[in-house]
Design a protein with these regions (language model features):
Chain B
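Sec-dependent N-terminal signal peptides
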Residues: 4-13
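N-terminal signal peptide c-region/cleavage motif recognized by signal peptidases
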Residues: 17-19
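Short, surface-exposed beta-strand/strand-loop-strand elements in extracellular ectodomains
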Residues: 96-110
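Extended, solvent-exposed segments with strong compositional bias
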Residues: 112-133
Length: 122, 171
């Protein structure tokens, strides 16, 4: 059992993309008419330098949003916080906020990763 | 004298009470369970070329299967969808229509009891396989991809790349 756990630790997150929280929530921003949420993206993929953020409706259609960066470089083994602002008129339609890896160094076949958190009432 | 002793006593009681209340401060232990999904790429995979007209990630064809691991910290909070390639993301100019086939399978799980049904319960639509992650822990997935050039014509020489897309979506 311990050997299995050590094995998991050794191989764990060797090349990983993480996003949290699972269920972010909107709060009123200091800008009138805009709501804001914050998500955290962790980059432990050596083959990925940039991540794109997006807001989508229930059918994964894009929703207009504002962020300081919608495409942001995240160094290996570091994380970035994304503050995402959406007009209050679109809040009801915004269901997902997603981060997508931008692959730049793929030799033959690679894995593009996308993680989506969901806005919902808990 | 008596008044002074009484005053000292009152002050003492107040001090004791004050210090007692200071020691009785509630110390909050808070936690915020936010949950997260982690997609790890264990192996990027490579295409082998068993025939001039075929590229395949199958080890028997000289390729290497892409392997991903998905970790979730909340049960019943995520589904994960894998889409195997239906085109090259980069290639030389092709000389015929290329047909892609692909599949995704669970290759290992961290919780054999609660993840036993992942493979049988998956939903396959075209080249996308979707799994409901009903338990916390890690699941390993292996992906196969084969590209066959039309008319059994040889692939033009050059570098070919294709992506498997892994999506972890909160539900």
């Amino acid at each position: 059992m311990y050997r299995y756990l050590i094995f998991l630790l050794l191989i764990g997150s060797a090349n990983a993309h993480q996003m949290s929280p699972t269920y972010p929530q909107w709060s009123q921003s200091y800008l009138d008419g805009l709501s804001v949420t914050r998500v955290r993206v962790f980059n432990k993929r050596k083959d990925v330098k940039y991540y794109e953020i997006g807001v989508f409706d229930k059918d994964m259609k894009p929703i207009p949003f504002v962020s300081q960066y919608d495409l942001r470089g995240i160094n290996y083994n570091t994380y970035a916080m994304f503050d995402v602002y959406v007009n209050n008129d679109y809040i009801k339609d915004a269901v997902y906020v997603c981060s997508t890896s931008m692959l730049t160094d793929v030799k033959s076949s690679g894995v593009a990763s996308k993680i989506c958190s969901k806005f919902k009432d808990l | 004298m008596i008044k002074e002793l009484a005053l000292i006593g009152i002050v003492g009681v107040i001090s004791y009470g004050g210090s007692k209340s200071a020691f009785a401060l509630d110390i909050p232990i808070s936690a915020s369970v936010t949950g997260s999904c982690v997609i790890s790429v264990e192996t990027n995979g490579t295409y082998g070329q068993p025939y001039a007209y075929k590229l395949s990630t199958t080890p028997a064809d000289g390729g290497e299967l892409p392997i991903t691991r998905v970790d979730v910290t909340l049960a019943d909070a995520y589904k994960v969808a894998f889409t195997t390639p239906d085109s090259f993301s980069s290639s030389p100019t092709l000389n015929d229509v290329v047909t892609f086939t692909g599949d995704t399978e669970v290759s290992a799980v961290s919780d054999a009891t609660n993840m036993a049904d992942y493979e049988t319960d998956k939903v396959e639509v075209d080249n996308t396989d979707t799994y409901e992650l009903t338990a916390t822990g890690s699941t390993w997935f292996k992906h196969s991809s084969t590209a066959t050039n039309g008319g059994d014509r040889a692939f033009p020489s050059g570098n070919y790349t294709a992506y498997v897309t892994a999506e972890c979506i909160a539900i």
